[in-house]
Amino acid sequence: MPIPRVLEPEVMADADEASEYDEMDFSATDQRFAERAAELARGARVIADIGSGNAKIPLAMCALLPAAASVCAVEMSAAMLAVAARNRARAGVSPRRLHLITGDAKRLPFAAASVSMITSNSLIHHIPEPRSVFREIARIARPGAPILIRDLVRPESEAVLEQLLHLHAAQSSLMQRRLFADSLRAALTVNEVREALDECGLAGVAVAQITDRHWSAERA
């Protein structure tokens, strides 16, 4: 049995926490996500990235996708959007290429069947009832649109959680270690993800654990 799920705040509203999160080094996992998204894109023109945070993943995607593709980065936190805007400016990416949108993942600002690809990384563990997000993804996706969703896996025990902290956050600050631990406790298990996706009409989405701490849900 995994440890009990302990929810964390849905929105990172604190500017200091947003800046601290931006300093955490997820570059390797971010790049792998962007590369997989580019592989799945199949010429998608409008890509919705849900819960984009500091926008480092959408920026990495923009570097790999054809020039005709645009990414709509949806984020609820004003503090995170401010960080995302700084990162976009620093990268020299046009707002027409990467749109930063204030929005709630449970009520996405897109028409039904209007989005040609949907991506999301490290959002689901923030959501008290993840089915609300999965239903919205099913609503806005065009029929058969590629989907790539990744997040953390809730550990089987506190001992496993401590091991993950040691392996992946030993050199991090106390706040960064706390953020990582809180996120692990708030995450879903692979079986919980599968059950939720099945209930929300997202046909053809395959779910697997891909690292010691991540799951991936994909539709090619």
Indicate residue ranges for each PLM-predicted region.
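Conserved beta-strand signature within the Rossmann-like core of class I S-adenosyl-L-methionine
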Residues: 145-151
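A short His-aromatic
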Residues: 125-126
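C-terminal alpha-helical "lid/dimerization" subdomain adjacent to the S-adenosyl-L-methionine
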Residues: 152-200, 206-208, 214
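A conserved beta-strand element that flanks and buttresses the S-adenosyl-L-methionine
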Residues: 119
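N-terminal, positively charged/glycine-rich alpha-helical extensions of SAM-dependent methyltransferases
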Residues: 1-20, 24
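Conserved alpha-helix/loop element of class I SAM-dependent methyltransferases that forms part
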Residues: 27-45
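Class I SAM-dependent methyltransferase SAM/SAH-binding core
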Residues: 48, 54-107
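A short glycine-rich, Lys/Arg-flanked "PGG" loop and its adjoining helix->strand segment in the class I
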Residues: 132-143
